[in-house]
Amino acid sequence: MSVITCGGCPGRLGLNQIKQLIGKNGAEVVHFATCMTAFKPKCRYAEKMKEEIEKMGAKVVMSSHF
């Protein structure tokens, strides 16, 4: 298990880190934090990030792992 941040808007830093975790460490599932999915306003980049992560081959859960 790894915990990283999204890297701030628009999430490119987080996507790069996730790509490495999938490729090098075999990560299979990514959980989005509450700040991206439940707080108001919700992250406007969350859906796009979800699509990009799924293209990398990982499952995305739109809620925290806690």
Swiss-Prot record:
SMART domains, per database record: CGGC
InterPro entries: CGGC_dom (IPR014925)
Pfam family membership, one: CGGC
Family from the record: To M.jannaschii MJ0582.
The protein's name: Uncharacterized protein MJ0766
Organism the protein comes from: Methanocaldococcus jannaschii (strain ATCC 43067 / DSM 2661 / JAL-1 / JCM 10045 / NBRC 100440) (Methanococcus jannaschii)
